[in-house]
Every structure is written in C-alpha cells, then in structure tokens.
C-alpha cells in the first residue's frame, strides 16, 4: 500500500520547490511590417544610403516638411551633392556619432508602459466625482494612426545633432539638412524613424512664418529650402580664399558625378543646386506696330502651371506657353516705337533643368469668397514627359524626364489637410511616405491622385528627373519580366498566411483571395493567362491605412479594376452561368442602344422645332420689312408730289395714285405732248370723286378714246411707247421749266388698299 502511494506521488504532477521562481512569459514579438518583408532579401547595406527607408516624426503639422525632405533625399544627384559638400564626413566618424543618436526601441517595455497608462486612466475614471468614462472603440489595426504608433514603438529612432563645425561651416539650414542626410546614410539599420527636431528649430529660428503650428504650404517650403541652400553655400564660399573657391561652371557637370565611398569627389562648385533644379525661361514679346521681337530671360527653380478641368500636364504646359495679348491697360512699352503699343507675349523654356519640380496651382484666390480655394480639377500626369515649349536655341530640347516623386495634398482647402509623398526608389519600386509610416505600393497606385472629386487626395508637386530612352526601355523590359515571373509564381506557389506575395516589389494582394495549389492544376488548365496581365490589388490593410484625413488612399477605389485571383474552393464556371452572363450583357447592350436611339430622336425633334421657330421668325421679319418699306415709300411720295396734286387728292395715298401702269402714263404723256404745240398745259377734266370724297386730276384724252378704252392697250403697245419716249429725251422736260413733268392719274384702284 505504501509502495502504491509512493508510485502515485511519483507519477503525479511535480510540486514546486520552496523558493523556485515561476517561468517568465516570452516577450511579445512586434508585428512584421510590409516594408520589412520587402527588405528581407536586400543583402549587404550600401554606403550611399540608397537602401535606407526611414520615416519622419510629425511634430504637429510638419507633414509639409517631411514630404519635401523625403523627395529631396531620394533624388540621387541632390543627396550626393549635399552629403559631399564641402567635404564628405568619414563613415567611421558618423558611426561613432550615431552610437549616441540612434536608439533602438524595447517593444515589450513600450507595451507595458501603454498597459500601465490604460490602467491608470481607468482608475482615474472610477474615482468619485469623475466624469463617466466613454466606451472606447477597439483600435483599427489597419488604420494609419495605429501603424504610426506601432512604428514609433518598434522601429529605431534617429536623432540629429548639429555637426556644422565638422563641416567647417556656420550653422544654417543647409548644415541641418546635411546632418539629416548623413545620419540616414551612415545608419546601420535600413528602416527607422528620423526625428528632425533640430532641422525644424533652425527653420523656425530663421523664418518666422514657420514658427506657428498652422498648416503650411509644401511648395512654398520647397522654394524656400532650395533658395536657402543656394544662399548658404554661396555665403560660405565667399568666405574662402580665392584659390579655394568654386570651379568654373563648365566643370560643374563632372563634379556632381559622385561615388558612394568616403573618398569620393566633392562638388567643388557652388552652383550644384543651379545645375540640378534651375532652368531658364525666355519671355518673347512682339510689338504689333513695328513687329520687333524683344526677349527677356529669367531663371526658375520650380515651374508653376495653371490648371484646367479634365486636362493633362502637357495641356497645362501648352497653356503656359500660349500667346497672350497685351492691350488696353496692359500695353507693352516698345523701345523701338517709343511708347505703349499692343503686343503679343509668349513664354518658352530656354534651358531645361536636370530635375524638374512641377507645381500644380491647386489653390486659387476667388473674388467671391475673398480667400483661397482648392481646385479639384482632374489633371493627368504621365510617367515620362518631354517638354515641347522650348526655344529654337535651347540646349537638349528633346530631353526625356521620368516621374520619380509626387507630393499629395489631402484635404478640402488650403488652410488644413495633410501631405504625403509617393517616391520611386532605385531598386524597390514605389513607396508611400506618410510621416512615420513607410509602405510599398504598386506603380498604378500613383495614378490615384489626378484629383477629380472634392475631399480626396490630389497631386500637388510633381518631381521629374532626366533619363534616357535606353533606361526607359530597360525598365519596361524588367517590368515585363517581373510580371511574367509573378504570373508563374501564382500558378506554381501559394501565398503566405498574411497575403503578401513572395515576389519582391509587388503590391499586397487581398488576403481573402487564394490561388490554386500545385495538386490541382487541371482545374484551371483551360484558362489562358496573358503575359501582360495587370498587377495585383493592394492589400486591404494597405488600402484601409490611408483613411481621411491623413490618408491619401481614399482614392484607392479609383484604381483600375483587376481580375481577381480564382478561389481554390470555387467551382469552374458552368455553361448555364456563362449563357446567363452573355444574355445579361446582350440585354444591357440592347438597352443602351435603345436609349441612344431615343436620345437621338429627341434631339432630332428639338432640331426640327428650332428650325420651324427660326423660319417663322424670318417670315415675320420679312413681313415687317415689307410693311416698313411701303410706309417709307408712301411718305417719300407725299414729300415729292406737286402742291396742286396734294391739294386735289385730299390725302390719298401713293397706292391710289400709282394704280396706273408706268407704260400707260408714258404713252399718255407722249400723246399729250404731240397734241400740244405751244407746250402749254391742257385743261384737265375733273375725275369722279374717290371713295374718301377726294377728286383726282385727269389728263385730256385724244379724240375717240375714253379712259376705259385707253386701259385696254396691249403690253406690246405700252413697251413701244416707253421705248419711243426714252429715245426722245427732248420731250423729257416740259416747256421752259427745268422740272420733270408730273403724271396724273386717270384710273382709281383700291385693290391694293383693300
């Protein structure tokens, strides 16, 4: 019995010994971000900083600064010029400095601190007199706010210090920018978060407009930063002795070709900012009086263009160089004419920059609202661009540009909103930089910010850098190869549990979508995959991470539709479903055709009614013109008729007096002139009274003729009499008077009056 109890105690659970410590829980592991998955096969860290992808902490409405700094860092020639001027700091010195500025996070400690803060908050809410605690919604792990918070808790934090003395320069905005770039380049971590506190302190100290926490303009900051860098570099160069100053501009192109090693060339010239960003505009003005053309050059660091609805960058540039008429108050002072003259003005580009910063003027001042208003015009921007509005003597007028960065403004107006940057890196495609969060995106994601609906994200500043046609062709070939590889991977492999594809550089796919396993290839053998299949959809966590207001991907719905990946559990499409689908398509097409025909019929009826109304209007105008002509003729006849005729007619109209034909009156007048030898007036018989009681004068008729018989003359006789009268001009004047003989009426006609 004792042995049995001992065996039970031996087989039972071991009792903890006195003083033994309980087993510790394993520390929580931070979640793996999409960026970390993309960088798993990067290899060794480079010394030029091209493989570093750091976010930037937002210190309250500093997103305008973060987005512009990210775009400038990933401009390879600009980054190399900043790091290598005036000299490049040795990597060893930078690594020693980073030992104190680069701090790695303790994820477990951060979680414990957060849990302790939550408990303290709950305890404070339970105190008597405290306001009732509002029920909190669970955190959305796909939101950008949650991702930014997790990045601040898990990723290394990089502080920047003032190292201007090591550069041999006084502290300025350029030296603080150099501190940022060198810290990232020398970091042994590919990912992390920069704290640009020192840079912001210098910016606010030197420029009062950035001292407030108000929303700032990213384009204004870009222009100010480039001008400040130029001013700081030239000011330091002026302090150096003459032999150590900048080289001639002819050597500046070679001096900016920098390598990534610590002993690389340095941009000895101070014009490296001009060589990269500066272009030259030529204003051509032609006087319309003397036709003399005058030219005036001006430089620019960024090009601002006006926008039009449903247009493109090319059309905006065409409008920028369109001819402008200078007239009225804007007349041009012509030196050749010596005064103000009307002229035509046109802007052309004389020298193209290596990096073209294109500012889309989305904020326009309106007189009605008396303030700036954001324009949500749809403006399409291409991946590759050629500028056509160049002068005839321009250097390299066929220069080809490629889009490498887009600064996006999210918000309904210029006084609030959020800025993010979408940047094309050297080896890892396009990345979204949203303050602390950095995520890979697809190439088509860049096309979601044309800006055609209010309240959504719009491209604000476009960065184009020079490239060659060979590089573009090589890139397209590489994209086709990657696309074919991704299609093969979809056919032969499966996705990970989190939905991220194995092939690097591709966007996330929906985790709900699955692909066929290798064991069932026959199910989809009848599907023919095109080699130019579109890329996959972004991951849902990627699409949801850009919610408003700090999220540009609210326009993710505008992404072109992509055929979904077939589900492994779905059955093949049956013939019945195919027939019903085709019937629906045919019914839809028939419905659209009938609607179009109905609309055309309505338009035809509207056009016909418009033609009828126009015809009626023209008829009314013709009738009114005839009536006005008759009235004016009657008035003219009354003015030119003899006084005795006016007295005897007692107000008869011209129509009553003019009832006789002109040929009849000519014939009768000829007979009167022949019968009268003394050119004296023949007594006129009184005409019977007219309808209104007035009497008309009547000429004396030859023997054997009556007024009625005279009216029976044929047309031929009348024409002969007219011809004889016209051939005998001596009878045109009567007697010794210089006036034309007046003709009297013998016949009353009331038909026209009636």
Swiss-Prot record:
Any one GO molecular function term? cysteine-type deubiquitinase activity
Its UniProt entry gives the catalysed reaction(s) as: Thiol-dependent hydrolysis of ester, thioester, amide, peptide and isopeptide bonds formed by the C-terminal Gly of ubiquitin (a 76-residue protein attached to proteins as an intracellular targeting signal)
- Stated family: Belongs to the peptidase C19 family.
**Alphabetized UniProt keyword annotations:** Coiled coil, Hydrolase, Protease, Thiol protease, Ubl conjugation pathway
UniProt-annotated stretches for the region Disordered: 1-31, 118-145, 236-269, 494-754
Q: Which Gene3D superfamilies does this chain map to?
A: Cysteine proteinases (3.90.70.10)
- Give every USP domain span: 54-467
This protein's gene is called creB
State where composition is biased (Basic and acidic residues): 236-245, 576-647, 717-732
Indicate what this protein is called per its UniProt record: Probable ubiquitin carboxyl-terminal hydrolase creB
């Amino acid at each position: 019995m004792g042995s049995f109890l001992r065996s039970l105690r031996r087989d039972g659970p071991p009792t903890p010994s006195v003083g033994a410590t309980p087993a510790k829980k394993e520390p929580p592991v931070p979640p793996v971000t999409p960026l970390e998955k993309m960088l798993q096969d990067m290899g060794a860290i480079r010394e030029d900083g091209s493989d570093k992808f750091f976010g930037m902490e937002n210190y309250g409405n500093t997103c305008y600064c973060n987005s512009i700094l990210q775009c400038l860092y990933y401009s390879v020639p600009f980054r190399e010029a900043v790091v290598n001027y005036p000299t490049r700091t040795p990597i060893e010195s930078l690594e020693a400095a980073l030992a104190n500025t680069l701090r790695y996070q303790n994820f477990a400690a951060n979680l414990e601190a957060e849990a302790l803060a939550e408990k303290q908050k709950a305890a404070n809410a339970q105190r008597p007199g405290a306001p009732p605690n509002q029920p909190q919604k669970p955190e959305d792990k796909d939101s950008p706010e949650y991702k930014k918070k997790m990045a601040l808790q898990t990723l290394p934090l990089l502080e920047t210090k003032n190292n201007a003395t090591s550069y041999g320069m006084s502290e300025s905005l350029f030296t603080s920018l150099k501190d940022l770039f060198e810290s990232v380049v020398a970091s042994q971590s590919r990912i992390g978060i920069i704290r640009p506190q020192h840079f912001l302190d210098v910016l606010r100290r030197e420029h009062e407009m950035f001292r407030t926490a108000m929303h700032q303009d990213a384009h204004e900051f870009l222009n100010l930063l480039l001008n400040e860098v130029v001013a700081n570099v030239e000011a330091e160069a002026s302090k150096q002795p003459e032999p150590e100053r900048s080289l001639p501009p002819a050597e500046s192109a070679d001096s900016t070709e920098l390598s990534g090693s610590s002993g690389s060339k340095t941009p000895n010239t101070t014009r490296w900012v001009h060589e990269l960003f500066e272009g030259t505009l030529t204003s051509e003005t032609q006087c319309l009086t003397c036709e003399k053309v005058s030219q005036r050059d001006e430089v620019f660091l960024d090009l601002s263009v006006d926008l039009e609805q449903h247009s493109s960058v090319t059309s905006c540039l065409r409008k920028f160089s369109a001819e402008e008429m200078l007239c009225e108050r804007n007349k041009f002072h012509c030196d050749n004419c010596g005064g103000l003259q009307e002229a035509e003005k046109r802007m052309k580009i004389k020298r193209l920059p290596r990096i073209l910063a294109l500012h889309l003027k989305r904020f326009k001042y309106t007189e009605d609202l008396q303030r700036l208003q954001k324009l949500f015009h749809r403006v399409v921007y291409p991946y590759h661009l050629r500028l056509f509005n160049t002068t005839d003597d321009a250097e390299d007028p066929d220069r080809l540009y490629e889009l490498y960065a887009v600064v996006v403004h999210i918000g309904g107006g210029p006084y609030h909103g959020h800025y993010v940057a979408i940047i094309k890196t050297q080896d890892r495609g396009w990345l979204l930089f949203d303050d602390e969060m950095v995520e890979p995106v697809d190439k088509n994601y860049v096309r979601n910010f044309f800006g055609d609906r209010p309240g959504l994200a719009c491209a604000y500043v476009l960065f184009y850098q020079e490239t060659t046609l060979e590089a573009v062709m090589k890139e397209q070939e590489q994209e086709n190869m990657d696309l074919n590889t991704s299609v093969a991977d979809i056919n032969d492999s499966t996705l990970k549990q989190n939905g991220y594809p194995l092939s690097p550089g591709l966007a996330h796919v929906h985790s709900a979508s699955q692909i066929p396993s290798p064991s069932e290839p026959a199910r989809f053998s009848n599907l023919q995959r095109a080699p130019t299949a579109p890329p996959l959809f972004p991951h849902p966590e990627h699409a949801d991470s850009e919610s408003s207001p700090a999220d540009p991907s609210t326009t993710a719905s505008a992404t072109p539709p992509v055929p979904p990946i077939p589900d492994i559990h779905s059955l093949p499409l049956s013939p019945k479903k195919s027939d019903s689908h085709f019937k629906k398509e045919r019914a839809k097409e028939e419905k659209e055709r009938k609607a179009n025909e109905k609309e055309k019929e309505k338009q035809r009826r509207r056009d016909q009614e418009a033609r009828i109304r126009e015809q009626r209007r023209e008829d009314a105008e013709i009738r009114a013109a005839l009536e006005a002509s008759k009235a004016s003729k009657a008035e003219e006849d009354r003015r030119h008729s003899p006084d005795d005729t006016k007295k005897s007619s007692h107000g008869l109209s011209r129509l009553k007096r003019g009832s006789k034909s002109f040929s009849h009156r000519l014939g009768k007048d000829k007979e009167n002139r022949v019968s009268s030898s003394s050119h004296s007036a023949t007594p006129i018989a009184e005409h019977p009274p007219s309808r209104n009681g007035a009497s008309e004068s009547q000429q004396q008729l030859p023997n054997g003729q009556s007024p009625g018989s005279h009216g029976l003359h044929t047309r031929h006789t009348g024409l002969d009499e007219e011809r004889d009268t016209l051939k005998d001009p001596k009878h045109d004047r009567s007697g010794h008077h210089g006036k034309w003989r007046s003709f009297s009426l013998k016949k009353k006609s009331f038909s026209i009056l009636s």
